[in-house]
């Protein structure tokens, strides 16, 4: 069983998301520790990027704040490496294709892969392949190698359609990293097709559009989850996009194997800044309990 699937063995999984470097990396580390200590089963880490197309205003603004702090992809890798020395729960990156393509090539723009490596180092990595040190590789291979070296268990790429996943999946698989599929409301055939190749868990998108807090979630999520389970009985399903309240978490916990919350957490961080860790820890505990209320009652 993969490390990510293990996260779904402790009742209904609660999966929080944060943008790394907002308001700063030290606070990010404190928040991650607080979430882990208060029941988070898996944590999604957003790498700051200048064009996060799947994100709504709340997470877009968090990316802007992190980039103003000059946070690079390598800074995030170093943070994960430090956290991994004390935390055993699965850690998953949520990022974008350009961050990966540009990693280590020396051509990164702001928020697209970090400070990069000298051109001659990138050339050595390109020639050395899997035998080269992680820091000497570039592009998909370099990113995957460094992520594995730092202790990342999975990756979510919201701007990469299913038809293009094979450009990434074999490389990440080689380094023991699950490429997690997202399934939005779509045809039954497409849901089954995506589910059949899913790794780690399936991220079921509650609503079409970008991330953000929603008052009402009207999609027939039960039917979507049922289709996923029919196509791939072994893969856990977690629902995200729009979940913010304990009541919503309880409702989603009745349907799926896990609940994902991002914008509601990032919004609190944007308001509280360096005072956020304690509040986010308490919120994590509340949402984990709510996600499992129906499960425990059963």
Where are these regions (language model features)?
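Active-site beta->alpha loop and helix N-cap motifs at the rims of alpha/beta catalytic domains
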Residues: 47-49, 61-108, 136-157
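Catalytic cores of alpha/beta
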Residues: 28-33, 187-195, 243-259
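Glycine-rich phosphate-binding active-site loops on the catalytic face of alpha/beta enzymes
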Residues: 45-50, 155-156, 161-164, 206-213, ...
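Active-site-adjacent beta->alpha loops and helix N-cap segments on the catalytic face
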Residues: 2-5, 51-57, 71-78, 138, ...
